[in-house]
């Protein structure tokens, strides 16, 4: 094709591609990318050409770019080899703040070879989907998993050393000896070994001080804390190189998989890989709904907590001023939580096909992702309240605790019926996972919220992660088990991203809170979420 001919479309919407670094001042490297849209255009000579809207894997959507076909390569083994060669060359010549990391660069030590998310150098630290900017004075370090050297190994083939020989069709026990225990609220508390609790601020401070002082035992603690659900298993290294020391410093994010969630994932592994079951698709509670409900739950908890704390102030003026500041803080946190869950959704969409499916389920799961099924699931999610709230909890509870009671007030206590249903759903969650076990206090606090905060909660309850115009996403098909697998992968993504350490400090508590929320919903992982593929395989979903 010459410059005087019409251009041929080379890439399609949704296709995974490799894209060259768009900034010519940076080293010439290739990033994992995805074609979001294809635009047919005409030049001055009325000749056709195509622009491709590209999203860079692991980057914020604000960095999406329109590029020509010359900047793109097909995602195949030959071009992957070129990607590794360019990355190796970039590592040799990088200077200053250039932060491109290639997972398969031969010069990296074997224990760090398979980087699953590649972050390019950007001047703006908000380039990562999970980059947030809420100021915080507390740092939380969590434990994460290691890696394998074998690129042909199943990314999710976990060690079976602690699994029962024949899995039982029910969830394992919630706690094991030596694991971190929980109080009635679902928060981690100290176990027999003296591990710090989730809410122990002094423990976080001590760990922060250790990190600043360069604790000599830090590496050993990281290795001992690694989860068996790591996507990879690191071989034991006989010596430590300078390059390996440098990469250890890049391990900024460590995510501890709690004992309860670990057992859910063991159960999921046994059901799929041992008993040859498949996940019922679409999930009863899809990932999009889980993420949305988490934001709504946290909004209610924060709002009620502010009211209870602020009411202790004696001076009315000072109390009102403090409440106003606290309400502003809650609104800011909730807005950031929306960004966090959207980042989790983006990571899931990118990593599902390559890293979040067991071999035993891959054909079935990908076979379900037909255009018709995706479209129908999207329609169901947009129009069906039962799909969003599959438990069907729609009974109203008055402040006196009577079902369908109004406590002498005509109509719902706090607003329209949808607002009331969502609020009471959140309050029941608090009751179930709280040590106080007194729903009247929570309802009293919710009832006394000022109109401004009620209006904000109403807006939050009506918020959706995906708009009705959004194209169908895989996150409306899959449920909690696949989301939990993504959380195991998440440290690799964040460690390879350009997000700053300060932003990570703010982000980690929100991720920790989300893990706590996920593991408190046992019903998302039970046997009702599985089916026999011989009976249901190849089915089409109808609206």
UniProtKB/Swiss-Prot annotation:
A Pfam family that the UniProt record links to this protein: MRG
Span of domain MRG: 249-542
The UniProt record lists the keyword Nucleus: yes
Bias kind Basic and acidic residues: ranges: 180-202, 210-224, 234-247
GO CC list: MSL complex; NuA4 histone acetyltransferase complex; nucleus; X chromosome
Processing after translation: Ubiquitinated by msl-2.
Key words of the record: Chromatin regulator, Chromosome, Developmental protein, Differentiation, Nucleus, Transcription, Transcription regulation, Ubl conjugation
Oligomer and partners: Component of the male-specific lethal (MSL) histone acetyltransferase complex, composed of mof, mle, msl-1, msl-2 and msl-3 proteins, as well as roX1 and roX2 non-coding RNAs.
UniProt-recorded name of the protein: Protein male-specific lethal-3
């Amino acid at each position: 094709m010459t410059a005087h001919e019409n251009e041929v479309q080379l890439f399609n919407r949704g296709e995974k591609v490799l894209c060259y670094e768009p900034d010519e001042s940076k080293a010439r490297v290739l990033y994992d990318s995805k074609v979001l849209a294809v635009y047919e255009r005409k030049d001055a000579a009325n000749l056709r050409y195509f622009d491709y809207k590209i999203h860079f894997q692991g980057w914020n959507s604000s960095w999406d770019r329109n590029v020509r076909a010359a900047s793109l390569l097909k995602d195949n083994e030959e071009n992957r080899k070129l990607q590794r060669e360019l990355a190796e060359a970039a590592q040799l010549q990088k200077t200053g703040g250039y932060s491109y990391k290639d997972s398969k660069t031969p010069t990296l030590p074997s224990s760090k070879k398979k980087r699953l998310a590649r972050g390019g150098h950007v001047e703006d630290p908000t380039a990562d989907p999970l980059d947030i900017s809420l100021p915080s004075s507390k740092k939380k370090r969590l434990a994460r998993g290691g890696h394998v050297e074998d690129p042909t190994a199943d990314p999710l083939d976990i060690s079976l050393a602690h699994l029962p020989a024949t899995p039982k069709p029910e969830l394992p026990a919630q706690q094991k000896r030596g694991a971190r225990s929980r109080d009635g609220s679902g928060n981690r508390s100290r176990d027999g070994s003296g591990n710090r609790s989730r809410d122990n601020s002094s423990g976080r401070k001590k760990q922060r001080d250790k990190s600043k002082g360069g604790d000599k035992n830090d590496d050993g603690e990281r290795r001992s804390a690694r989860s068996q659900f790591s996507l990879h298993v690191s071989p034991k290294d006989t010596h430590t190189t300078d390059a390996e020391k440098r990469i250890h410093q890049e391990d900024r994010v460590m995510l501890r998989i709690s004992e309860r969630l670990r057992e859910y994932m063991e159960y999921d592994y046994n059901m799929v890989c041992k008993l040859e079951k498949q996940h019922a698709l679409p999930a009863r509670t899809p990932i999009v709904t889980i993420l949305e409900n988490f934001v709504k739950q946290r909004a209610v908890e924060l709002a009620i907590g502010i009211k209870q704390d602020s009411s202790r102030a004696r001076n009315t003026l000072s109390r009102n001023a403090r409440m106003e500041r606290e309400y502003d803080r809650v609104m800011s946190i909730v807005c950031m939580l929306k960004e966090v869950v959207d980042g989790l959704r983006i990571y899931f969409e990118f990593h599902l096909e390559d890293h979040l499916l067991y071999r035993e389920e891959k054909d079935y799961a990908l076979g379900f992702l037909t255009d018709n099924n995706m479209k129908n699931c999207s329609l169901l999610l947009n129009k069906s309240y039962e799909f969003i709230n599959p438990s069907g909890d729609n009974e109203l509870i008055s402040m006196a605790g009577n079902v369908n009671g109004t406590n002498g007030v005509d109509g719902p206590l706090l607003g329209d019926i949808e607002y009331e249903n969502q609020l009471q759903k959140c309050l029941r969650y608090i009751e179930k996972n709280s040590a106080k076990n007194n729903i009247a206090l929570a309802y009293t606090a919710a009832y006394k919220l000022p109109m401004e905060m009620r209006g904000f909660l109403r807006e939050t309850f009506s918020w959706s992660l995906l708009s009705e115009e959004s194209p169908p996403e895989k996150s409306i098909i899959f449920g909690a088990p696949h989301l939990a697998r993504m959380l195991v992968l998440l440290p690799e993504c964040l460690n390879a991203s350009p997000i700053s350490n300060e932003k990570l400090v703010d982000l980690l508590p929100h991720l920790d809170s989300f893990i706590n929320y996920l593991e408190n919903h046992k019903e998302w992982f039970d046997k009702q979420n599985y089916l026999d593929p011989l009976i249901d395989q190849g089915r089409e979903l109808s609206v």
